[in-house]
Amino acid sequence: VTNYFDVGTAQDWFEYNDKPVFFCDIDGTLIKSQTRVGSNTYYDPPIVLENNVKIMLEYQSKGAQIIFTTSRPKSVDHITRSMLESLGFKNIQLISGLLNSKRILINDFNAGNPFPRAEAINLFRDDDLLKNFL
């Protein structure tokens, strides 16, 4: 047998496979939705969706990679990064300035592992029940 990656025991495999890559929206997902103008802007202290943040921090502490995505303009990246750090997130990767429209994840899978490796979760805005989907 050649060209394989030995992850050890079945338990080792489950731990290795339990390190997903998340593309996670911020507003309405980790904090109550903030906007450029109005009563709850990017400049105001966030109203944290505690349960959602907790589960994402748990995944990150186990080695999951989180790439934060947002329609917030790049001009407020420093505010966004600071807010994410204050929530406890580390190694922040941020994609900002996205269109406020449908987001589509495209990924491949192969015959050696015929199970689809891409998933999508749609939460109601400001819903704090992410753990029910993970």
Segments the model singles out, each with a brief description of its role:
Residues V1-K19:
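Conserved alpha/beta core of the MobA/IspD/sugar-nucleotide pyrophosphorylase nucleotidyltransferase superfamily
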Residues K19-L134:
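HAD-like aspartate-dependent phosphatase fold
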